[in-house]
Amino acid sequence: MGRILLVEDEYNVRVLLEHVLIDAGYEVDSAATVAEAKSLLDSVHYDLLLADGRLPDGTGMMLADQAEESGIKALIITGYAFQLAELGRYEFLMKPVRPAELVGAIERILGAPAC
């Protein structure tokens, strides 16, 4: 089982993604802002950061940079096509994300199913 930090500012999207990830067998912590996520990244070990590309106080790429320094893999989800060029070295999915597509991408990045 992998542990995922989910960072999504839209409450309904965050709750939906949490359920998808938990149903797939992952342990999930969530945050709505970069500040909340940084606090969690500093205190808990995660296997994957799943972050929205645009957040109220920064970007998912900022968080991915911090996560990468700690050996944590990152997957960015975005609804903004113009952001794709900024993503560069990070894996990404376009919103809206289908549950099977999300779980498949996570399994590919982590190298194994959750359970």
Q: Where do the protein language model's features map onto the residues?
A:
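The feature encodes the CheY-like receiver
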Residues: 56
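Acidic catalytic/metal-coordinating carboxylates
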Residues: 33, 59-62
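C-terminal output helix
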Residues: 84, 97-115
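Hydrophobic/aromatic residues positioned on beta-strands within the core alpha/beta folds
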Residues: 72-78
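Acidic, metal-coordinating helix/loop segments flanking the phosphotransfer/catalytic sites
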Residues: 30-48
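Conserved acidic carboxylate
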Residues: 8
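Active-site residues of response regulator receiver
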Residues: 52
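Two-component/phosphorelay signaling modules centered on CheY-like receiver
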Residues: 11-29
